[in-house]
């Protein structure tokens, strides 16, 4: 039995991160026990040597399950769905499943990046705060249309 079979999962998360929300929701819907580890992005805790040793990408959420570390919300959710098939998150019907993947990818690729603090700060630095809001609103509305 691997160490991931017997160890409690740890979720490194920032309370306001929509990416982290997705994983917390999935863990709860699947009824999985995990330990919540707060990472304060505003204080730069994701950039500390300790966190970067665990997760060189410096992203939250990050899920640790035994010797496995996964640092992307959709990858984490896919791992949970495969590893713990009880209480499935996805429908069995292939077409409905594909629509779920489509919605998840639109959020992850087209909407969420414009809610990311690093992206918003960069846009504001280069173009100003009015342009930052304009960019973010444009891409978020487009993703939901």
Swiss-Prot record:
Residues 7-88 form the GST N-terminal domain. SUPFAM superfamilies: GST C-terminal domain-like, Thioredoxin-like. One of its GO terms (cellular component) is cytoplasm. InterPro entries: Glutathione-S-Trfase_C_sf, Glutathione_S-Trfase, Glutathione_S-Trfase_N, GST_Zeta, GST_Zeta_N, Thioredoxin-like_sf. One of its GO terms (molecular function) is glutathione transferase activity. Residues 93-145 form the GST C-terminal domain. Keywords: Transferase. Pfam families: GST_N_3. It catalyses: RX + glutathione = an S-substituted glutathione + a halide anion + H(+). It is an enzyme of class 2 (transferase). Induction: Accumulates in response to the phytohormone ethylene. GO terms for biological process: glutathione metabolic process; L-phenylalanine catabolic process. Glutathione binds at residues 17-22, 60, 72-73, 112, 116-118. Its EC number is 2.5.1.18. Conjugation of reduced glutathione to a wide number of exogenous and endogenous hydrophobic electrophiles. NCBIfam families: maiA (TIGR01262). Belongs to the GST superfamily. Zeta family. This is Glutathione S-transferase 2. It comes from Dianthus caryophyllus. The gene is GST2.
